[in-house]
Amino acid sequence: KHLGSPDYQKAITQHKSYIKALQSCGLEVHVLESCEDYPDSTFVEDVALITPKCAIFTRPGAESRRGEVEQIETVLRDQFDNAERVEAPGTIEAGDIMMVDNHYYIGLSDRTNIQGAEQIIGILNKYGYTGSTVNLKEVLHLKTGLSYLENNQLVICGEFKNDPIFSRFDHIDIPEEESYAANCIWVNDNVLIPTGYPLAKGKIISTGYNVIEVDVSEYKKLDGGLSCLSLRY
């Protein structure tokens, strides 16, 4: 479904509100300079995976995005003692990676191939973590339809609901008509969700969380979700 072209000024305003929402949860937010050469670079989550022990720079499946990795590497390399990199022929975007404690689920998608996933798992193993793959059928990225909160609680939608891989979790089921809200962010006992999804909001509140709504309608038009807009560590 085509949602129309994004309104640039509205997107800027929404981005500022997103930053304020993260700050209201107690996070220190580092805002990067705009990178006009790479229009997708606002979706900063995809180009690096940050773990407690290392930073892993990815190799996006969208060739037009590969230059973004160098930009983020320049910013982050000095902040981590251990930095790793995914190499060709592997491709991976971190929107396909969901961390649950010390285990990482990796979606195999149009953007993430098995070579990229295997490289990530090898790196994770080196630092004492584990990883496994999930085949995607419909969504762009794994976290388009899944968000892990804490305490075994998983926000889940669509193709993942009946997947036995996720049967061990306590599900917060998001109805198909509000599937965009399945991409949300848990931050210090708060859950950030996109504005305008009352059923999803109610379900998450009923689980005991404080919900903060953030309008990201202009980023939805670009297939971007809440988690895509930040690297959290």
Show the residue positions of the predicted features.
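The feature marks the mature, well-folded catalytic cores of soluble enzymes
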Residues: K1-Y233
